[in-house]
């Protein structure tokens, strides 16, 4: 299953206010949050309970960058995602969806 979502980073996104004044860059945690919400919407399943297996941030994300978020589920059940902006790969990662029953309580 391959799914693609597009999102353009709004120039007035609140995270730009304090994340490098004079050189606004979208924080990685915001980028990851956008990817997780995009994947959750596409698969119709909450990702509140998931394990982030790996994430690599490869290139900065700037205001008005048009992003493409693509994900696919591997045979292992892991979901692989890539975020690109034109020819630039912005981020890549893998997540595992866990059931609430398999999540240990603390």
Predicted regions and their residues:
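A generic hydrophobic-segment detector
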Residues: 1, 42, 46, 53, ...
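Catalytic strand-loop segment that frames the active site of acyl-thioester-processing enzymes
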Residues: 1-26
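Generic structural signal for short, solvent-exposed loop/turn connectors between secondary structure elements
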Residues: 1-6, 41-49, 72-79
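HotDog/MaoC-like acyl-thioester-processing domains
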Residues: 3, 72-106
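Hydrophobic residues in beta-strands and at strand termini
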Residues: 9-11, 57, 97
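Surface-exposed loop/turn and secondary-structure junction residues enriched for glycine/proline
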Residues: 19, 23, 29, 58-60, ...
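Active-site helix/loop of acyl-thioester processing domains in fatty-acid/polyketide metabolism
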Residues: 25-48
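Hydrophobic beta-sheet segments that form the core/acyl-binding groove
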Residues: 50, 54-87
